[in-house]
Amino acid sequence: MKISIISFGSSPREWLGLYKKEINKIKQFKYQIEFINLSEHSQENIELKKMLETKDILQKIPKNSSCYLFTERGKTVTSKEFSQLLNFPNICFIIGGSYGVDEKLIAKSRPDIGFLSFGKLTFAHKIFKLIVLEQIYRGFSIKFNRKYHHAD
């Protein structure tokens, strides 16, 4: 069982230890974590850049995966609601590029992709990856009744 996280840019070396710590905690739930790091396009036209990067994302989504895109216009979920998304053997989370993604192209090409939000704040990619990993661990802890999540 695998969780893929598609994002842009490589992970800074100093953050790899933090990612690995969270990944190791997730492994106890029999899931592997795969980072799919894409290169941002240097296109100056922002709409064209978003379209090209969205096409790159669509090509990298693993087959037979339940897929979710993080976007500020997505559905805001609680940790308990997020844990319910972890009921599939293969899951893919997408973190768009610095200008986001072409959401219309995503919706047209893959209407099965859910749009999620962790709130109205904007995060650096390196921080958001860590937040996603922590929420995956928290979600599994909720799902399997482990003592980690204390809120209702």
Curated annotation (Swiss-Prot):
Reaction catalysed by this enzyme: pseudouridine(1915) in 23S rRNA + S-adenosyl-L-methionine = N(3)-methylpseudouridine(1915) in 23S rRNA + S-adenosyl-L-homocysteine + H(+)
Protein location: Cytoplasm
Superkingdom of origin: Bacteria
Annotated binding of S-adenosyl-L-methionine, by residue: 69, 96, 118-123
Signal peptide as annotated in the record: none
EC class name: transferase
Pfam families for this protein: SPOUT_MTase
The protein's name in its UniProt record: Ribosomal RNA large subunit methyltransferase H
Source species: Mesomycoplasma hyopneumoniae (strain 7448) (Mycoplasma hyopneumoniae)
Gene behind the chain: rlmH
